[in-house]
Amino acid sequence: MAKRDYYEVLGVAKNASDEDLKKAYRKLAMKYHPDRNPDSKEAEEKFKEAKEAYEVLGDEQKRAAYDRYGHAGVDPNAAGMGGGMGGGFADAFGDIFGEIFGAGRRGGGGPQVYRGADLKYALEITLEQAASGFDTEIRVPSWENCDTCHGSGAKAGTSPKTCRTCGGSGAVRMQQGFFSVQQTCPTCHGTGKEITDPCPSCDGVGRTRRNKTLQVKIPAGIDDGMRIRSSGNGEPGINGGPPGDLYVEIHIKQHKIFQRDGDDLHCELTIPFTTAALGGELQVPTLGGKAEISIPEGTQSGKTFRLRAKGIRGVRGSYPGDLYCHVVVETPVRLSDEQKAILRQFEASLNDGGDRHSPQSKSWTDRVKEFFS
C-alpha cells in the first residue's frame, strides 16, 4: 500500500512551522500510543505512521529532500542513497546526464565511498527521569570494523585484489537506449576490491557484529518521541567513508498518576462526597513532593484545580508548566442499614429546602422539560 503524504499524516499544512509539526506529532503520539491502546493494531500502525512522518519533517535536511522528491527522497533503500541524505535523485540523474554533458559521478575515479548507516536505539524512561534528566549507559548492537583485518576483509599477510569486473572503480556502466547508466558493481558491491583469501574472523566481510557501550546524557524536560543524536556512533563507513550517527529515541512509560501534555501535567483527584460538600484541605502529589489545595464547599465533579509551576520544565523552556487536578467526587459503596437510613434522612432534609441545594440537578431538569415541551 502506498504511503500517505507525511503532512497529511500529521494533519498540518506544507508550510507548517517546526513548532506546529511538534504539536501535531505530540497530539497523535499521545492519542495512539501503544500503552494507551494495548490491544489496538490500528492504533499501533497510526502511532508508527506519525512517528515516521515526524522523523522526516522534523529534520531540516530530510524535510527539504521530501518536499523536493517525495518519499523517494528520504527512502534509505533508494538507489544512490548510500546510507545518508547525500545521494538519491541527485546521484541518479548525475549518472545519466554525466555521460552526455561530461560531468563525472561523485567520486567516480575510484572505489565508491559510502557513509555508514545511522543506528536507532529505543530507550524507555520514567516520567520522573524525563523531568529531572540523568546520565545513563546503553549497549548498542552494531557492525564494527574487524579487529583482525582492520576492515579490509583480507586474511593477515594478504591484501584485497583489484576487482576484475569494474577495474577498481566500484561501478559499472549499463547501456539503456540512448543513456549510459552507472550502477554499483555487482561483484565487489562498490568497494573496487575482491577478497581472494578472506579473513577467518569476519569471513571476508571486514566487519563484525558486537555491542558497544556508550554514555548518554538525557536532558531534563525531554518528551516522548524526542531523539538524542550521538554523532559518529553509527555504523562505520565503507571505503573510508564517515561513520553514521546514533539516534537515541525516548519513550516515556505510562505513569500511575500523571498524564503529560507538553510541559503540563494532569491528574485525577478523587475526593469523598463529604469533602466535596463541606470543603476542606487536601494533599495532592506532584513530581517534586506534596502540595496542599483548598477544596471549597459545594465542589462538583469535573472541577479543575490548577497548581502553577508544578508541571515540567521543557528542554527549551524557561518556566515549568502547570499541574491540573481534575476532581472526581466519589460515591460511597457497601453502606450499612444504619448509614442508608442516615442518608435517606439527609436526603429528606435537602428536599425540604427546595432546589437550592442541587443547582446542577435543577438546571438539568429544566433542560429536559424544555426538550420535551
From Swiss-Prot:
Cofactor note: Binds 2 Zn(2+) ions per monomer.
Cofactor: Zn(2+)
GO molecular-function terms, A-Z: ATP binding; heat shock protein binding; unfolded protein binding; zinc ion binding
Residues in J domain copies: 5-70
CXXCXGXG motif repeats by residue range: 146-153, 163-170, 185-192, 199-206
Purpose of the protein: Participates actively in the response to hyperosmotic and heat shock by preventing the aggregation of stress-denatured proteins and by disaggregating proteins, also in an autonomous, DnaK-independent fashion. Unfolded proteins bind initially to DnaJ; upon interaction with the DnaJ-bound protein, DnaK hydrolyzes its bound ATP, resulting in the formation of a stable complex. GrpE releases ADP from DnaK; ATP binding to DnaK triggers the release of the substrate protein, thus completing the reaction cycle.
Zinc finger (CR-type) residue numbers: 133-211
Keywords in alphabetical order: Chaperone, Cytoplasm, DNA replication, Metal-binding, Repeat, Stress response, Zinc, Zinc-finger
Assembly information from the UniProt record: Homodimer.
A GO CC annotation given for this chain: cytoplasm
Binding site for Zn(2+) 2: 163, 166, 185, 188
Gene source species: Bordetella bronchiseptica (strain ATCC BAA-588 / NCTC 13252 / RB50)
Entry-linked PANTHER family: CHAPERONE PROTEIN DNAJ (PTHR43096:SF48), DNAJ HOMOLOG 1, MITOCHONDRIAL-RELATED (PTHR43096)
Binding site for Zn(2+) 1: 146, 149, 199, 202
InterPro entries hit by this protein: DnaJ (IPR012724), DnaJ_C (IPR002939), DnaJ_domain (IPR001623), DnaJ_domain_CS (IPR018253), HSP40/DnaJ_pept-bd (IPR008971), HSP_DnaJ_Cys-rich_dom (IPR001305), HSP_DnaJ_Cys-rich_dom_sf (IPR036410), J_dom_sf (IPR036869)
Name used for this protein in its record: Chaperone protein DnaJ
Alphabetical list of Pfam families matching this protein: DnaJ, DnaJ_C, DnaJ_CXXCXGXG
SUPFAM superfamilies membership: Chaperone J-domain, DnaJ/Hsp40 cysteine-rich domain, HSP40/DnaJ peptide-binding domain
Domain notes: The J domain is necessary and sufficient to stimulate DnaK ATPase activity. Zinc center 1 plays an important role in the autonomous, DnaK-independent chaperone activity of DnaJ. Zinc center 2 is essential for interaction with DnaK and for DnaJ activity.
Family in the record: Belongs to the DnaJ family.
GO biological process: chaperone cofactor-dependent protein refolding; DNA replication; protein refolding; response to heat
Subcellular localization, as worded in the UniProt entry: Cytoplasm
Encoding gene, per UniProt annotation: dnaJ
